[in-house]
Regions:
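Surface-exposed amphipathic alpha-helical tracts and adjacent flexible/coil segments at the periphery
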Residues: 1-269
Length: 269
């Protein structure tokens, strides 16, 4: 116990416990991996890991030249860590800094994950160190967080070693297992601030229809999700769908900027 042992940092203040709570896990201990550096000249310890461990590999017997394809798991690619369902236990234990692995992830990933964990921490604080709602209500809330976290990039989830598990869990699929995928549709060509309307050019996907879930991302805009409704074409006419190669306008609740990218969000089957 930090308080009982009076463990203090350089400034004489009690140190704060931090923990990695969510996101991609490296197969190596303490980041001591040189696969990327040795094979591609990109050092993981300088933030440039090419993650070649995430690929599929053949295992070859040196003596007999027998080859085996490991096709049911990616044996060097762990599932992503997720702790939100037992976050109250970690906070009760004294953790005060939560680390989220978000390197090279999209703005929608950062927004979603940070929002979920912030909501969980605020709920715990509201109850003065306990969940302030009943068991059924907190189970429903955790299920909601799990659903939202599953919609952004992930390789499947596990608890890590926090709850006593000794063997790691490996992903069964290359790339993301998110329940939704984003498909690039086009870019913002203009924004009319006085009426909060954004104009876009549909350059990639076949069509956008009324009711479609959309995502807008940009350096300053961050990540903004909306549902396509009241779609107007370049002539100002109301449409239920827009075809590739057309300009269209949507009313937005947030400021959108020229050059921002718009994506169509599709349920992954």
């Amino acid at each position: 116990d930090i308080i009982e042992q009076d463990i203090r940092g350089p400034k004489g203040e009690l140190i704060r416990i931090e923990m990695f709570c969510h996101g991609a896990l490296c197969m190596a201990v303490s980041g001591k991996c040189y696969l990327s550096l040795n094979n591609l000249g990109a050092s993981a310890n300088r933030g440039a890991c090419m993650q070649i461990c995430r690929r599929g590999y053949l295992v070859k017997d040196k003596e007999s030249d027998l080859e085996l394809e490991i096709d049911n798991q990616y044996i060097m690619s762990p599932k992503d860590l997720k702790t939100i369902h037992f976050l109250n236990k970690t906070l009760d234990a004294g953790v005060r800094v939560l680390k989220i692995e978000g390197r090279a992830r999209g703005a929608e990933y950062v927004k979603t994950v940070v929002e979920c964990y912030k909501e969980a921490v605020e709920l715990w604080k509201e109850g003065n160190g306990q969940w302030p709602i009943g068991d059924e209500a907190i189970e429903a809330k955790i299920e909601e967080w799990n659903m939202r976290l599953a919609r952004v990039f992930n390789r499947g989830f596990w608890d890590g070693y926090y709850l006593g598990q000794r063997l790691g869990e490996w992903t069964h699929k290359y790339g993301s297992r998110a329940t939704r995928k984003k498909v690039f549709a086009g870019k913002c060509t203009n924004f009319f601030k006085n009426i909060s309307v954004a104009e876009f050019y549909l350059e990639a996907t076949k069509e956008i229809k009324e009711g479609d879930e959309l995502l807008i991302t940009g350096e300053t805009t961050g990540a903004y999700e909306l549902v396509a409704k009241d779609i107007h074409d370049a002539k100002g006419e109301l449409r239920t769908e827009i075809q590739k190669g057309e300009y269209f306008a949507l009313k937005t609740e947030k400021i959108v900027r020229r050059g921002d990218r718009i994506f169509l969000l599709k349920v992954e089957e």
